[in-house]
């Protein structure tokens, strides 16, 4: 029987296999207890085109002293930043790769903020 982490990794492998068949760039999300990370990866999977995370110095300063990287507000900020950076890199349409995490809470907030900022998926 698989533990919780192994189940998540299995789901993420299945998702990435489906996205690879589509042949589009993917917006991948990784979530920890402290931070959230987002990257836009090329269609062949070999190159990171844009990235953003709550571990960045500018983001931590913007969130303030009380602002933690592990909140919905921080995820929304990262969603907007990744959309801006992806558009600057010439990427308009992506496939959303939630890395096996549930589409809920911070992952959902990041996705919705990226959509509002103009990224299509």
Curated annotation (Swiss-Prot):
Name assigned to this protein:
Large ribosomal subunit protein uL18
SUPFAM superfamilies (alphabetical): Translational machinery components
Keyword Kinase recorded: no
| Cysteine pairings via disulfide bonds | none
Q: Which gene encodes it?
A: rplR
Instruction: Please give the organism.
Output: Leptothrix cholodnii (strain ATCC 51168 / LMG 8142 / SP-6) (Leptothrix discophora (strain SP-6))
Entry annotated with the keyword Endoplasmic reticulum:
no
**Which InterPro entries is this protein grouped with?**
Ribosomal_uL18_bac-type, Ribosomal_uL18_bac/euk
- Which processes are annotated in GO (biological process)? translation
Q: How does it assemble?
A: Part of the 50S ribosomal subunit; part of the 5S rRNA/L5/L18/L25 subcomplex. Contacts the 5S and 23S rRNAs.
Query: Per the record, GO CC terms?
Result: cytosolic large ribosomal subunit
Q: Report keywords, A-Z.
A: Ribonucleoprotein, Ribosomal protein, RNA-binding, rRNA-binding
The family line of this record is: Belongs to the universal ribosomal protein uL18 family.
State its role.
This is one of the proteins that bind and probably mediate the attachment of the 5S RNA into the large ribosomal subunit, where it forms part of the central protuberance.
User: Molecular function terms in GO for this entry?
Assistant: 5S rRNA binding; structural constituent of ribosome
HAMAP family linked to this entry:
Ribosomal_uL18_B
């Amino acid at each position: 029987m698989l533990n919780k982490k192994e189940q998540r990794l299995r789901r993420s492998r299945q998702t990435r296999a489906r996205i690879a068949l589509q042949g589009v760039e993917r917006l991948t999300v990784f979530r920890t207890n402290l931070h959230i990370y987002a990257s836009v990866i090329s269609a062949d999977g070999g190159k990171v085109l844009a990235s953003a995370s709550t571990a960045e110095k500018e983001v931590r300063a913007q969130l303030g002293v009380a602002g933690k990287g592990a909140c919905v507000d921080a995820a929304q900020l990262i969603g907007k930043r990744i959309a801006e950076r992806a558009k600057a890199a010439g990427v308009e349409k992506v496939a959303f790769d939630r890395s096996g995490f549930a589409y809920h809470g911070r992952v959902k907030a990041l996705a919705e903020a990226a959509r509002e900022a103009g990224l299509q998926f």
